[in-house]
Amino acid sequence: MIKLTKAEKNGLHGEITVPGDKSISHRALMFGAIAEGKTVIDNFLMSDDVMHTMGVFRALGVEIDHTESQATVIGKGLTNFKAPSAGLDMGNSGTSTRLLMGLLSKQPFDLNIFGDSSLSKRPLRRVADPLSMMNAQFELSNDEFLPAVIKANTELNGITYHMPVASAQVKSAILLAGIQAEGETTIIEDLPSRDHTERMLRQFGGQIKTDNGVITVKKQSKLSGQHVLVPSDISSAAFFMVAGLITPNSEITIKKVGVNPTRDGVIKLLERMGAEITQKPIASDGEPLADITVKAQTLHGIAITAEDIPGAVDELPILALAATQAVGDTIISGAEELRVKETDRISTVISELTKLGADIDEKPDGMVIHGGTLLHTSNGSTLLDSHGDHRIGMMNVIASLITEGDVVLTGEEAMSVSYPGFVEDVSSIKREWL
């Protein structure tokens, strides 16, 4: 339980470097493990979720060393993992679970996988179904959930799969199985989802074709270890972008942020709301990077629809907070995906922000946020809850910066899933400037 206070009248100022991208850190570990030779990962995110991915590969016999911001992986190739002595703990990580269901679907031994109570409520059928079409075999609790068994298997077959809903996790699971499968595996996307897996497969020497939403891979004979520079996580940077925009008299620069065009939906949506966001590109061999500067300014309500969701699904909680401060209404629709995140984020976003006086209507697939609300506590103090969800916890911290009265946050430990040290970093730009 921690006490949070409003920002000073002169606002938030300074430069901040947020931790490495969670999605890319997961994938760098995975590709490093299945490659041959050494992979060095810089600006590696040491968060709870990513450490569970690391723990899985160590249990499978992969040698991994790390310092505070670098990991070194000695790859074993795709066929040299050892059978673990116990079940594989996914913690709270949906990324680990879904991607590894594909990556580990062709091992000569059963793999028992389990997670915490939150992860055990998240559906797995939508990733298990296409993988089963490839001859992968799973035993899921109640045919849907963890704990589960990835069954021993010696053969995968390529498929053509039309994605029913844009999902980078499902797509990546199929691709990671596809590089081990006989024949071609083709995925058809109507809406683009984040493409970190495709980019990283190329970086590690894999063959992949992408053409206007059609992605094709074949069985890969060998991948080679690489040096991977992980950009700062745009999903984490989004909290500081919104903080700078909605806290009066602020100006913040967020350094070396990954601005992959399949992930920068939050920037596009904030710009549609009227934000002027300055990007200063940084030369990079891998993912595109930029320094991002924001200043306090007036925002306007917009409509966020299904086609916007894949590029900004993780940022919708903090966008909802921004919308409470915008002029006019913001309508979020086509966002059913939020209901199967770490929490039902439609419900938890509304639960927490309305405690501070926000005016929000819940819809089955989103919400309507009536803007222009001065956030305030009840009787001088309000208790907010992270609900065990890192992004809800971080949204609450940013909300406190513009809230009259004292805010007390419970469940703050959830933020370490993606951003250990988040509260300290917020404090560093919040201190009173002379």
UniProtKB/Swiss-Prot annotation:
Molecular functions per Gene Ontology: 3-phosphoshikimate 1-carboxyvinyltransferase activity
Record-listed phosphoenolpyruvate binding positions: 22, 94, 122, 169, 345, 391
Active-site residue list: 314
Primary localization class, coarse: cytoplasm
InterPro entries: Enolpyruvate_Tfrase_dom, Enolpyruvate_Tfrase_sf, EPSP_synthase, EPSP_synthase_CS, RNA3'P_cycl/enolpyr_Trfase_a/b
Functional pathway: Metabolic intermediate biosynthesis; chorismate biosynthesis; chorismate from D-erythrose 4-phosphate and phosphoenolpyruvate: step 6/7
Entry binding sites for 3-phosphoshikimate: 22-23, 27, 167, 169, 314, 341
Gene Ontology biological process terms from the UniProt entry: amino acid biosynthetic process; aromatic amino acid family biosynthetic process; chorismate biosynthetic process
Keywords, ordered alphabetically: Amino-acid biosynthesis, Aromatic amino acid biosynthesis, Cytoplasm, Transferase
Intracellular or extracellular location(s): Cytoplasm
Pfam families named in the record: EPSP_synthase
Enzyme Commission number, as recorded: 2.5.1.19
Family to which the UniProt record says this protein belongs: Belongs to the EPSP synthase family.
Role played: Catalyzes the transfer of the enolpyruvyl moiety of phosphoenolpyruvate (PEP) to the 5-hydroxyl of shikimate-3-phosphate (S3P) to produce enolpyruvyl shikimate-3-phosphate and inorganic phosphate.
Binding partners and assembly: Monomer.
Name of the protein this chain belongs to: 3-phosphoshikimate 1-carboxyvinyltransferase
Species of origin: Leuconostoc mesenteroides subsp. mesenteroides (strain ATCC 8293 / DSM 20343 / BCRC 11652 / CCM 1803 / JCM 6124 / NCDO 523 / NBRC 100496 / NCIMB 8023 / NCTC 12954 / NRRL B-1118 / 37Y)
Gene: aroA
